[in-house]
Amino acid sequence: MTRRGKWLLAFGVTSTLIAAACAGAVFWLDRDADRTEANCSSQVQAFEQTVQVSRKWTEKEIPGIGDYLDIHWLGKPASDPCSRAPGPTDWYYQGFVRLRPQDATALRAAKEWKPQAPEQIWPDLMPYAPANPQWLRTSIDTLYHGAIHLDPGTGTLFFSLVDG
């Protein structure tokens, strides 16, 4: 075999090994991505089904909310947050907040309200809804967009918001 033939043979073998290694790496990474995506999906599903009580919501997100007594809320993604596509995922949020009496009074006075019930309340939140509410509605446009509803009789605030 000539010197040139040996060089071509070595180059061919090396190229084949590199191509095989790359194909194996791509397969391995794709397999791990599927596992990560499945883990992400199960975490999102668990989050969606768990009524949250964390004090995530403040004056910054819902002006006039004050130092509320308690809160129960849910978040649901508008699209697949586990997708490998670039870009953020918008989230929908709903929740009930029991306001302090002085905060409920101040909030009612600070905004223009109209009588209107919420269009939809997610079933998992229904246990936290007041009995026989007299809902008043107004819009907010902060980091979150949507509507808030106030039942002045109980000082309960219901929010239905989307970020993004």
PLM features per residue range, with description:
Residues 1-18, 22-26:
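N-terminal Sec-pathway targeting helices
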Residues 132-139:
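Short, internal acidic amphipathic alpha-helical interface segments
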Residues 63-132:
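Mature extracytoplasmic domains of secretory-pathway proteins
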Residues 139-153, 158-162:
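Short, exposed beta-strand-loop hairpins at the edges of beta-sheets
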Residues 22-90:
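N-terminal export/targeting and maturation segments
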